[in-house]
Amino acid sequence: MEEEGYQWARRCGNNAVEDPFVYEPPLFFLPQDQHHMHGLMPNEDFIANKFVTSTLYSGPRIQDIANALALVEPLTHPVREISKSTVPLLERSTLSKVDRYTLKVKNNSNGMCDDGYKWRKYGQKSIKNSPNPRSYYKCTNPICNAKKQVERSIDESNTYIITYEGFHFHYTYPFFLPDKTRQWPNKKTKIHKHNAQDMNKKSQTQEESKEAQLGELTNQNHPVNKAQENTPANLEEGLFFPVDQCRPQQGLLEDVVAPAMKNIPTRDSVLTAS
């Protein structure tokens, strides 16, 4: 049989190798015993078709896929039912564990310490078996849904129990939006120096003016000054007119006024008369 195969390959050459379906391949050369051939391979057409299909396409057939789906499909329904029932529970558990946490914070002398965010109070509620009410706050940032609940502890009066819900989607305000009223420390010191100098000057001038006014008032109200004012010379000056005023005036009034009315007493005449 080996010699016949060698002769067949010699006669056919490379064409038998390139196109095995034109010439009968050597794989189908069976022994000459027909009984043995029929015993081993009862259906030549089935084997040939199987060989051809195996050489053309080696992947799964449609019937194989249909059989596989028929076997697997009944098991998918309970899995889907379980997934629908368990997903909401998983989501709730993750939300309750991750998005909600509680802290205990001690207040200082200025009140409750600031956490860096701005909050708006939107409600208050009394709690059962607790004298301290619970306050509800919400973040003022419009893109943020964070909330918190503040409650004073029953055991410690200087401790707050804060429960946060959700997360902040922005930075804290002292670093993200600085206050407009705040200024840099160097500028503040310079401004304070100038203001202090101006205030010192104004205060000094005001004090000097007040001291001068007080000094004048004390000098006027001093008993020595009052005694000097009440001397006879000062009293005479108040009673009598000065000599210059008593001199006759040159003009037309001399022709009208009588001479007797011109004799106005003066200090010199009084002294001489006395």
From Swiss-Prot:
Coiled-coil segments: 193-222
Gene Ontology CC: nucleus
DNA-binding region: 108-173
Biased composition range(s): Basic and acidic residues: 195-213
Keywords for the protein's UniProt record, in alphabetical order: Coiled coil, DNA-binding, Nucleus, Transcription, Transcription regulation
Family matches, as SMART domains: WRKY
Subcellular location: Nucleus
Comp. bias intervals (Polar residues): 216-228
Region (Disordered): 188-228
GO MF assignments: DNA-binding transcription factor activity; transcription cis-regulatory region binding
InterPro entries, per database record: WRKY_dom, WRKY_dom_sf, WRKY_plant
Family: Belongs to the WRKY group II-c family.
Function: Transcription factor. Interacts specifically with the W box (5'-(T)TGAC[CT]-3'), a frequently occurring elicitor-responsive cis-acting element.
Name this polypeptide is given: Probable WRKY transcription factor 49
Organism: Arabidopsis thaliana (Mouse-ear cress)
Higher taxonomy: Eukaryota, Viridiplantae, Streptophyta, Embryophyta, Tracheophyta
